[in-house]
Amino acid sequence: MLAIAILAWGQAGVAINEQNMKFERGVKPDPIKVKPPVDNTIPIDTSTVYFALIDSAQQCIKLEQWQQAEHFLLEAIRSEPSNPSNSLLLSNIATMQRQQGRLNEALRNYSMAIDITPNAVTLLHNRAAVYILLDSIARAQADYERIMMIDESDVESRYTHGMLALNMGDAKTAQKDFNDILRINPNSGMAKQGQGYLHKHAGEYDKAAQCFSEVINVKPSATLLANRADCYLATKRLNDASLDIANALELDPDDPYIYILRAKLNKLRYNRNDMERDIKLAIAHGLDAAEARAMIGE
């Protein structure tokens, strides 16, 4: 007996991250790692066609031959349509489709996998991530609420649920979610980070910067440094903002919003040439030109 192979998570995982959360800079969270699809220790009969097809799919996955891997997994499902392990295979198919930008197909396959294993928390996390990519925020929220009912200790669902609520202006729900995280884990950096976004949303920039600092001192990230820099810009602590922006760019030189922050800094310092340079850099890193200028009031 062997275990069903799953995707190498570094190759084709669905994580809730800065790209698929689509938050504005003011409330964009750090990435949250999501575990691999489901249990990878389900025993199967190695003598069956089902296993042989899965083994072929795994070989393709190792070579990042996603379409061929998908073909073998679909053939495995067709060979044993009532096999409960098909939930895992559908999840792998959905993950590969998500990596290829085939979001509607990924959504359909995650949903079929959930129909087989309705309480699989990781599948619900992954479907919620696709809903976010598709701007179906209400449906993503519903999946996170379902996760919270299944597993009260799942802090990632509460954090992302709270961040989505905050992004829609619902600070009350966000506060409840972050308080619930503190109830589960009084020392949670995730809750402290969420509180920082709440303070920033309310215009309480000094309090927000303090919350971000507590998390940065333990685990610095480009996102948190950029958000703290934004708070420092709002309170005219320009030297502190400059340092955070420089450190954020070292960690993530491809984030266009960090160049926008530096453009704002240069505008406040009346360095117009440097401001224009940073606007161009933000555009070169993928930000729409009109949006870039609007963000710094140009």
What are these regions (language model features)?
Residues 79-82, 116, 150, 184, ...:
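Structural marker of alpha-solenoid helical repeat scaffolds
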Residues 62-63, 96-99, 133-134, 167-168, ...:
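Register position in tetratricopeptide repeats
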Residues 50, 84-88, 121-122, 155-156, ...:
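Helix-start (N-cap) detector for alpha-helical repeat units in TPR-like alpha-solenoids
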Residues 88-92, 126, 160-163, 194, ...:
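Canonical tetratricopeptide repeat
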Residues 25, 40-44, 260-298:
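Terminal, low-structured helical/coil segments at or just beyond the last alpha-helical repeat
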